[in-house]
Curated annotation (Swiss-Prot):
Was named after 'sesquipedalian', an unnecessarily long description of a simple thing. Residues 134-189 are annotated as: Disordered. This is Sesquipedalian-1. Gene3D superfamilies: Pleckstrin-homology domain (PH domain)/Phosphotyrosine-binding domain (PTB). Belongs to the sesquipedalian family. GO terms for biological process: endosome organization; receptor recycling; retrograde transport, endosome to Golgi. The keyword Phosphoprotein applies. Its main location: other.
Length: 234
């Protein structure tokens, strides 16, 4: 893997918060002693410096595919960072105290992306279980026929509603005019001329009443039937 040294140096010393930092004893090669170095953990990258005030790291350890375990060593509070594969040598480190040892082991064990993926997967499963068992996510109407009804768009986005659609109310028809009192259904058939004369008399009678010319007028209901209808002035 090729890494940009300048980018790594900037990332190691930037002002962003670190996941863990402190002094650890790092063992060198075979037969070499341990050196006290300043370690900084950012994400899945472990930097180590010669001192806390150093601006450039001495080395970088990429924490992917590794395991962190306690080891028996001449240093107290020692642990090792091991990688899969026989060619990769373990990094043996030692803390100053038991609390520092536990803090570093916990932080390094949780630094890899593999661990983060497992955590995200577990959280997704818990969230899905909470959503399935939460009554707040149920629809207001338990009727299985209830469907989401699309509403007109607002600002280019469709607004949906889980409430059942209210039935449309048909407009009322205008009231029918009152029927005239007539016995035409039972009486003899009336010609068009007779109907014209009858309704003409009614119209003239109403006009005269409106003008105040007449007080009453007898209008035959059916011409030739002998029956009459009296209209009184209101």
């Amino acid at each position: 893997m090729k890494l940009n040294e300048r980018s790594l140096a900037f990332y190691a010393t930037c002002d962003a918060p670190v996941d863990n930092a402190g002094f650890l004893y790092k063992r060198g090669g075979r037969g070499a002693g341990s050196h006290r170095r300043w370690f900084v953990l950012r994400g899945n990258i472990l930097f180590y410096f010669e001192s806390e005030s150093s601006r450039e790291p001495l080395g970088v350890i990429l924490l992917e595919g590794c395991t962190v375990e306690l080891v028996d060593a001449r240093e107290e509070f020692a642990f090792a960072v091991r990688f899969a594969g026989g060619r990769s040598r373990p990094y043996v480190l030692a803390a100053d105290s038991q609390a520092a040892l536990e803090g570093w082991v916990k932080a390094l064990s949780r630094a890899s992306f593999h661990y983060l993926r497992l955590v995200v997967r577990e959280l997704e499963q818990q969230l899905a279980a909470m959503r399935e068992g939460s009554p707040a996510n149920a629809l207001p109407d338990a009727n299985p026929s209830t469907v989401l009804n699309p509403k007109p768009k607002e600002n280019g986005r469709a607004v949906w509603s889980a409430l059942p659609e209210q039935p449309a109310v048909a407009p009322r028809r205008p009231p029918l005019p009152p029927r005239r009192r007539a016995s035409a259904a039972n009486g003899p058939s009336v010609s068009f001329a007779q109907l014209h004369e009858r309704y003409g008399l009614e119209v003239r009678a109403l006009r005269n009443q409106w003008r105040g010319g007449l007080t009453s007028l007898e209008v035959p209901c059916h011409p030739g039937s002998g029956e009459t209808q009296t209209q009184d002035q209101p």
